[in-house]
Amino acid sequence: MAIVTLPNKSVAVNPLKQSQALGASLAFLGLKGMIPLFHGSQGCTAFAKVVLVRHFREAIPLATTAMTEVTTILGGEDNIEQAILTLVEKSSPEIIGLCSTGLTETRGDDIERFLKDIRDRHPEISHLPIVFAPTPDFKGALQDGFAAAVESIVQEIPQPGTTRSEQVTILAGSAFTPGDLQEIKEIVTAFGLVPIFVPDIGASLDGHLDEEYSSVTTSGTTVKQLQEVGCSAFTIALGESMRGAARILEDRFNIPYEVFSELTGLEPVDEFIQALAILSSNSVPEKYCRQRRQLQDAMLDTHFYFGAKRISLALEPDLLWSMVKFLQSMGTQIHAAVTTTRSPLLEQLPIKSVTIGDLEDFEQLAVESDLLIGNSNLAAIAKRLSIPHYRLGIPIYDRLGNGHYTKVGYRGSMEVLFGIGNLFIDAEEARVKNFDENFVTGHG
């Protein structure tokens, strides 16, 4: 059981967390024909857009209600109305995801009433789904905003219908990359199941070149698929943060669910594969038996480099849980853990303590580590401390292929093992080289 600590300071120095609105927009981008709409100032949207564009290296559709000093005082209903009508006219979206920001949450705009009144005044948009997620960026973090968006989606769009025994809903949390979702989709379909991902950034943000420019997402989960979620026989929630959305589906449609908090490592993947076999009443495909043996061999090859290594992590709670459990299974020691927001998982972490803080806290705690794990904002810390840095999370600016990176399943687990193992090998070679140079030149 970990002790959760919060540093006693009134300012974030070198922040680790990203805003809830950014997380919600990421979730909305996993829907086809979507354009996320930020109800706030232009700067809020511009910052989120820059982060996502630099991370995925893709064109990201984001819109804003462009609140000013005057409209903030007088109220933002007119801005929302004009923004929605403009998007409908110029972009023809199939669905709009509306996110609040710290500015409009502080003012207290009643956005749900605004939307009702706008629909009453404009019956021509009555067919258009508009999903609202409350995402104040003065509290919580990316993971919270992502979860809030998914909960709003499953609360508003799915419709009741006849249960389809082969159909499963997969609620994919913010810890999973587009490459992760593609791997999970391949595994699930191999068992003869028909998955509906909510959301499916594996289809929309996987880095593909469309024939022409579009101001909305061209791939992802469709509105029709979202409406059919109520017909699923089972819900698979990937990440503890998706439990709330799974409960909503259980309450609305009496659909049972199971939460998988991790899909990296031999035992978690075994449990996932076994659950799919039971759910589908099909045997495990031979290719996954072979991949399992490959992972076992990879664990044998790499465990010499992992044993007793001290690792410090700065990640969102769901991702932190998954990596801590995986790294400990390989014999490493968790030297420090810093995260962004509260989660039921934090107290259950099998480490001494976890800090909800910023990168200043992380730099102080990570001294004498053998490896740092976190997003690209850790790069300067890694350089100052002369410690190798394994990039994980959002944003990653200084590496290519973030949309295709995979860390789940047997194959993804091997990718993580080899990636971290090679860093340990490079660090050891550099240490030996420095020792030899100092020995030859006589420096102590």
UniProtKB/Swiss-Prot annotation:
What this protein is reported to do is described as: This protein may play a role in the biosynthesis of the prosthetic group of nitrogenase (FeMo cofactor).
UniProt key word Translocase:
no
MF terms per GO, please? nitrogenase activity
- What's the source species for this entry? Nostoc sp. (strain PCC 7120 / SAG 25.82 / UTEX 2576)
**In the UniProt record, what gene is named as encoding this protein?**
nifN
Source domain of life is: Bacteria
* PANTHER family, alphabetized: LIGHT-INDEPENDENT PROTOCHLOROPHYLLIDE REDUCTASE SUBUNIT B
Q: What is this protein called?
A: Nitrogenase iron-molybdenum cofactor biosynthesis protein NifN
Alphabetized UniProt keyword annotations: Nitrogen fixation
Its annotated pathway?
A: Cofactor biosynthesis; Fe-Mo cofactor biosynthesis
The disulfide bonds in this chain are none
Q: According to its UniProt record, which protein family does this protein belong to?
A: Belongs to the NifD/NifK/NifE/NifN family.
User: Which Pfam families has this protein been placed in?
Assistant: Oxidored_nitro (PF00148)
Q: Which GO terms describe its biological process?
A: nitrogen fixation; protein-containing complex assembly
